[in-house]
UniProtKB/Swiss-Prot annotation:
A cellular-component GO term for this protein: cytosol
Enzyme Commission code: 1.4.4.2
Biological process terms in GO annotation: glycine decarboxylation via glycine cleavage system
SUBUNIT field: The glycine cleavage system is composed of four proteins: P, T, L and H.
Protein origin, superkingdom: Bacteria
Summary of the function given for this chain in its UniProt record: The glycine cleavage system catalyzes the degradation of glycine. The P protein binds the alpha-amino group of glycine through its pyridoxal phosphate cofactor; CO(2) is released and the remaining methylamine moiety is then transferred to the lipoamide cofactor of the H protein.
Listed name of the protein: Glycine dehydrogenase (decarboxylating) 2
Length: 956
């Protein structure tokens, strides 16, 4: 370092890169020495095929410091104009209770956890999600709810699919009320097209005139009207038609529940229960239904079971009915949820309680009645006189003038043909109502004076629509209304869950890397969080700038030509990408191309997504090294050449290796007229070294919650934007807001408010930083592989003996020799303070390990030592020192009660059970329950909150 360029070197802004990447230079060299290579470059040369290596570095802006990045992003955010939005249409301003904002939404203990597939270390969020299900079933008066879906429009499309599967009416027509939200109709039309359903849109009163397998009604309607649906539903049932109702949760605090009117399915959004609008998301949608449809409901369902000691414990129930597991037989590809947002909504209900929520609903309705009365006094005509929180004004030729006056007063109304819509919400005040009167009528009124003219409460809700039944009577919704008690309840749940705040989560194919604090901060900025997704475009310049900038970044990283940011999950990205392929073929007069080739090792969402666009799935074999069998591929191509639509393939492969023949595979598909869908789940092993576009793929989705640092949230949110080559750009998802078709999500930018996280990651890392992250992810995985290979068989390796960013250890031989299963090893790792790797995917009886670039050598070594110790424990079972029925593996995990209880009937010590690799003085994460009985939970299905006696005290 010379004095001539000292300042430039001190200002290099590379600090964040070293903070994101786990191993420092010294640790990297130690790992390289273990691998017997001289440098990272040499290791990459031995791992990544030369013919797919990028010829030049990515052309991204130089890395910014955290301070610079936040300043840049603040400048972008400031371009958004945050008006008072009364647009409604399923999106409402809300007050996020500060105790939830700080202790859940902004808390890495909640947002860095993974989906609770390991329930013994997930009891906290499982309880919160069970509360969510109880909240939904109570408010809707249904019997069963799932633990959230991606958005309300997606939930409506899923409801249509459920109706088709469960209905005894053989029609192929689905009825949609003309008063549903337009974005919901968009997504239904897309889904229906590829299921070959006909969609009829008409007033709900005309449902009896149609022979349909199912119907969707909105309650209240998108224009605000409230009317009793009981007779309409009864008439539909007489024709064996199933009826789904899209309902508003806050409205259900004062309106008669859809379940009380006979609904078969109820869907909607929990957004207004304390989750910011965020320009469209992320939000937790919901679906509730009848008990008899429990095997048909999509998404995750939390259930009550027991552990090995017979104590109540929670788990995800009926996992074998999840659609991604059903593969090509699926009607849905749902494999994620919106857990973080569902938890926030459930905590909102816990904090406010039934009385607080009902008071809120009463207040919103009263303000709406006062607003309507003042407008009528000024001569404004209402389209409907029965409403909850939304009124529609018949303004005719005055529509534009009134709309513009409102805009001039920084008020957003909903613009309809010759009409204006106004939706009030929790945040609306009396002053807001008076401002609306002034803008709309140019007259001043006083709220108190107008209220005096009203009759009894609920004067604008028909008597047969007023709720009389109780809800949220479980003690959990009636106990935590002081901030002190709520804070302790939240903390008690958080303390039960393992997250990245505790240690490595080495889940293969999940990329549980650092979610840096600086990247998370902008999510709660009001310039991002309070934007309505259907606000006028000139108010949304900040989001448009962010989306364009982020898309440009992804284009450079992937080698594609265009991006859509609309899909709300990786599976939804797959669906959108396959639709783009099918629309492309149709545009060329080749809509007969409907064969999708999929390797036998593929994730279950691949065949599920292909099934959803009516593709016929043909499986391609893999060889003993885990690669696509080229001979079998060529045979399948020749057999289906004229009908070949696409091939779906993951790269690096699902088996964790860089297939040498990937370019040849792409060429073979293209020669036969097909398109290549490259699943971006493993993009963390590509960035900066290769790219889907360079390899030869046509379309990919990217999991922003994997490679690009959006946190997993304990089971969502996620995002799955899709990139395409130029010939597919015209077939990306559209939206009615832009007068285009093909929507897969409710809003054009999907879960827009979490885009700043991934934008910030790329801005902080720059091209070299992103490349180094990829290299270190590969280094960490190969180091684990090298250290474990003397103890466990490594199932798949590349041509030169290397793995990509993950490795698979094969436990099948050990199960044969000892009886110890992969589940036993996974549960035993909890006793060492680790989350288990991915179990039995992509091969049954294995564990797939992905350390990511963010873990240090110290953490890797502790994990390796744990697995080596476990191997020695297995040897004791093999040798007969421990019996198969009584050893620390089959009895794992062990709890604090095991350590301190009076009874210990085991052949091994408590110290061996609870502190297998550390002394008792060291910190340890404790599972809060013993191993959970999955079979019992499915045979005795309970998906609502158990009696309060089953809960331990959360105040002690």
């Amino acid at each position: 370092m010379t004095n001539n360029n000292l300042l430039a070197q001190l200002n290099d802004n590379l600090d964040f890169i070293s903070r994101h990447n786990g191993p420092d230079r010294t640790q990297q060299q130690h790992m390289l020495d273990t691998l017997k290579v001289d440098s990272i470059e040499q290791m990459i040369d031995k791992t990544v095929p030369d013919n797919i290596r990028l010829l030049q570095p990515m052309a991204l802006a130089k890395p910014q410091s955290e301070i610079e990045m936040l300043a840049t992003l603040k400048g972008i955010a400031s371009k958004n104009k945050v008006n008072r939005s009364y647009i409604g249409q399923g999106y409402y301003d809300t007050h996020v209770p500060h105790v939830i904002l700080r202790n859940v939404f902004e808390n890495p203990g909640w947002y860095t956890a993974y989906t609770p597939y390991q329930p013994e270390i997930s009891q906290g969020r499982l309880e919160a999600l069970l509360n969510f299900q109880q909240m939904i079933t109570d408010l809707t008066a249904m019997e069963l709810s799932n633990a959230s879906l991606l958005d309300e429009a997606t939930a409506a499309a899923e409801a249509m699919s459920l109706c088709k599967r469960a209905s005894k009416n053989k029609s192929n027509v689905f009825f949609v009320s003309d008063d549903v939200h337009p974005q919901t109709l968009d997504v239904i039309n897309t889904r229906a097209k590829y299921f070959s359903f006909e969609v009829v849109v008409a007033p709900c009163s005309e449902l009896e005139n149609h022979d349909v397998f199912g119907a969707l009604l909105q309650y209240p309607g998108t224009t605000g009207q409230v009317h009793n649906l009981e007779k309409i539903i009864e008439q539909a049932h007489s024709k064996k038609t199933l009826v789904a109702v899209a309902a508003d949760l806050l409205a259900l605090t004062v309106l008669k529940a859809p379940g009380e009117m006979g609904a078969d399915v109820v869907i909607g959004s929990a957004q207004r229960f304390g989750v910011p609008m965020g320009y469209g998301g992320p939000h937790a949608a919901f679906m509730a239904t009848k008990e008899k449809y429990k095997r048909t409901i999509p998404g995750r369902v939390i259930g009550v079971s027991i552990d090995s000691k017979g104590k109540p414990a929670l788990r995800m129930a009926m996992q074998t009915r999840e659609q991604h597991i059903r593969r090509e037989k699926a009607n849905s590809n749902i494999c994620t949820a919106q857990a973080l947002l569902a938890n926030m909504a459930s905590f909102y209900a816990v904090y406010h309680g039934p009385q607080g929520l009902r008071k809120m609903g009463r207040r919103v309705n009263r303000l709406t009645s006062v607003l309507a009365a003042g407008l009528q006094k000024a001569g404004i005509e209402l389209v409907h006189n029965d409403f909850f929180d939304t009124i529609t004004l018949q303004t005719n030729e005055k529509t534009d003038a009134i709309y513009q006056r409102a805009l001039a007063a920084d008020l957003n109304l909903r613009l309809l043909p010759d009409q204006l819509g106004i939706s009030l919400d929790e945040t609306t005040t009396s002053a807001d109502v008076e401002a609306l009167w002034l803008a709309i009528t140019e007259q001043s009124f006083n709220v108190d004076d107008i209220e005096q003219t009203l009759s009894a409460e609920f004067c604008n809700i028909p008597a047969d629509c007023q709720r009389t039944s109780e809800y949220l009577s479980h003690p959990v919704f009636n106990s935590y209304h002081s901030e002190t008690r709520m804070l302790r309840y939240l903390k008690s749940l958080e303390n039960k869950d393992f997250s990245l705040t505790h240690g490595m989560i080495p889940l293969g194919s999940c990329t549980m890397k650092l979610n840096a604090t600086a990247q998370m901060i902008p999510v709660t900025w009001p310039e991002f969080s309070r934007m309505h997704p259907f606000a006028p475009s000139d108010q949304c310049t900040g989001y448009e700038t962010l989306a364009e900038s982020f898309s440009d970044m992804l284009i450079e990283i992937t080698g594609y030509d265009a991006f859509s940011l609309q899909p709300n999950s990786g599976a939804q990205g797959e669906y959108a990408g396959l639709i783009a392929i099918q629309r492309y073929h149709a545009s060329r007069g080749e809509d007969y191309r409907n064969i999708c080739l999929i390797p036998s090792s593929a994730h279950g969402t691949n065949p599920a997504s292909a099934s959803m666009v009516s593709m016929r799935i043909v499986l391609v074999n893999c060889d003993k090294e885990g690669n696509v069998d080229l001979d079998d591929l060529k045979e399948k191509i020749n057999l289906h050449r004229d009908q070949l639509s696409a091939m779906m393939i993951t790269y690096p492969s699902t088996h964790g290796v860089y297939e040498e023949s990937i370019k040849e595979i792409c060429e073979l598909i293209h020669e036969a007229g097909g398109q290549v869908y490259l699943d971006g789940a493993n993009m963390n092993a590509q960035v900066g070294l290769t790219s889907p576009g360079f390899i030869g793929a046509d379309v990919s989705h990217l999991n922003l919650h994997k490679t690009f640092c959006i946190p997993h949230g304990g089971g969502g949110p996620g995002m799955g934007p899709i990139g395409v080559k130029s010939h597919l750009a015209d077939f990306l998802p559209g939206h009615s807001v832009t007068n285009t078709v093909g929507a897969v999500s409710a809003t054009a930018l999907g879960s827009a408010s979490i885009l700043p996280i991934s934008w910030a990651y790329i801005a902080l890392m720059g091209a070299e930083g992103l490349k180094s992250a990829t290299e270190l992810a590969i280094l960490n995985a190969n180091y684990i592989m090298e250290k474990l290979s003397p103890h466990y068989p490594i199932l798949f390796r590349g041509k030169q003996g290397r793995v990509a960013h993950e490795c698979i250890i094969d436990l099948r031989p050990l199960k044969e020799s000892s009886g110890i299963s992969e589940e036993d090893v996974a549960k035993r790792l909890m006793d060492f303070g680790f989350h288990a790797p991915t179990m039995s995917f992509p091969v049954a009886g294995t564990l797939m390990i992905e350390p990511t670039e963010s873990e240090s050598l110290e953490e890797l070594d502790k994990f390796i030592d744990a697995l080596i110790t476990i191997r020695h424990e297995i040897a004791k079972v093999e040798e007969g020192t421990w019996t198969l029925a009584d050893n620390p593996l089959v009895n794992a995990p062990h709890t604090l009660n095991d350590l301190t209880g009076s009874d210990w009937p085991r052949a091994y010590s408590r110290l061996t059970a609870c502190y297998p690799s550390s002394c008792p003085s060291q910190p340890k994460f404790w599972p809060t329950t013993n191993r959970i009985d999955n079979v019992y939970g499915d045979r005795n299905l309970i998906c609502s909150c158990p009696p309060i006696e089953s809960y331990q005290s959360t105040d002690t």
